[in-house]
Amino acid sequence: MDGVTENNRVSAVQRYLDFNLERQKDLEEIVMLASVICNSPIALISLMDFDIQIIKAKIGTEANVMPRSTSFCTHAVEMDEIMVVKDATKDERFATAPVVINDPHIRFYASANLKSYDGYNVGTLCVYDTTPKDLTQQQLECLAALANQVSHIMELDRSLNQLKKQNCVLREVARIESHELRQPVASIMGVMMLMKEIPYTQNPEYLELLDKSVNQLDERIRMIVSHVNDYPE
């Protein structure tokens, strides 16, 4: 992977790091399913940052962060297909990795990539085992389907976070604009009150129409601000 592509990929990763904790349970359920379907004791959902692997959900391990330099998933995000390592001790890429030669003595690995909306491999849904093995075609398809589900969940969360930020900006704009609009309206309403105290015999219906229009405008401004404030934060 060239430097420009990797920088773009890492930029895509940054969009998903602040994951909504309300959906953490969804991710935990998916890693549990991956573990059961693939009959593997360890399963992870992780994002691949520039030099670290950030674990967002897990089963069978206590790790939260791992260096990318010795990570199986570093190789996985560089390809588009599912990656399978049947026996890590026989694969020169991983035979000397710390997790292979030391506890937990990983032997098997399989992963499906998590994709951003613009097509970058931002992370993986992966499973590990301490004994060499392979997966059936059905297991591989299920792993890919679960990874797609993770991608959809994370993209939904990113979109909702973006919408909340836009709503905050919109509320602030509405607050400022309502002040700017209501100030002259309030002045006009004040003048109207003074005019009502003065006998006005020529075309009084014009005064009533103007008074009604100003009050309607004031009410409309209040409604707009109230509607904007109802948007989710």
Predicted features and spans:
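Residue-level recognition of the "H+4" position in the DHp/HisKA helix
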Residues: 176, 180-183
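Regulatory loop-to-helix N-cap segments in sensory/regulatory domains
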Residues: 65, 128-145
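Conserved C-terminal segment of the DHp
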Residues: 190-201, 212, 230
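Conserved DHp (HisKA) dimerization/phosphotransfer helix of two-component histidine kinases, i.e.
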Residues: 208-233
